[in-house]
């Protein structure tokens, strides 16, 4: 798997060999960042259920100011660290080895993000729980990208964010939501 654009274009991304993660295919990452476009430049990116870190690394390659990765799997977190080290990106990165659902409320109280990418394992029903947590905090017009299967029932009816675009790629859908108002 390789980075599809930006300063690191063409560089290899190491992935977990034990199939514990499901990396977003290169063509889907390219499509995701084609939608985001130049808006990523100079902004912050939160990669939840980060796996190999490919999406957050792609964001940095395309000009994001910083990326934060949250991944509870020890092997996956180690792969993220190795990828970050090989690209010498440590000054732009924070990696949290934490359970997303337990840690996200704490993280979002202390930091604001411009882009939030949610890609939990399929069929674990964590997209809705993750969106529930995000819905409870001020997201400052953040763009939230949710990766899911068409066989999953995701609730996109939210009081402080709305869906602006969905792109379907075979058995994967990327939904783009944007924050609309402050929610206390």
Regions flagged by a language model, labelled:
Residues 1-184:
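Class I S-adenosyl-L-methionine-dependent methyltransferase catalytic core
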């Amino acid at each position: 798997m390789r980075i599809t654009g930006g300063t690191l274009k063409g560089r290899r991304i190491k992935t977990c060999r034990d199939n514990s993660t499901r990396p977003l295919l290169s063509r889907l990452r390219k499509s995701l960042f084609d939608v985001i476009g130049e808006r990523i430049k100079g902004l912050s990116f939160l990669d939840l259920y980060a796996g190999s870190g490919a999406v957050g690394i792609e964001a940095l390659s395309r000009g994001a100011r910083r990326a934060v990765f949250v991944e509870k799997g020890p092997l996956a977190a180690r792969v993220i660290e190795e990828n970050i080290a090989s690209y010498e990106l440590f000054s732009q990165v924070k990696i949290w080895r934490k359970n997303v659902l337990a840690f996200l409320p704490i993280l979002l109280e202390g930091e604001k993000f411009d882009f939030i990418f949610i890609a939990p394992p399929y069929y674990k029903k964590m997209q809705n729980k993750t969106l529930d947590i995000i819905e409870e905090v001020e997201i400052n017009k953040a763009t939230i990208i949710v990766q899911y299967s068409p066989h999953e029932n995701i609730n996109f009816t939210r009081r402080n964010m709305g869906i602006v675009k969905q792109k379907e790629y075979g058995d994967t859908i990327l939904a783009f939501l944007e924050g609309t108002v402050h929610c206390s």
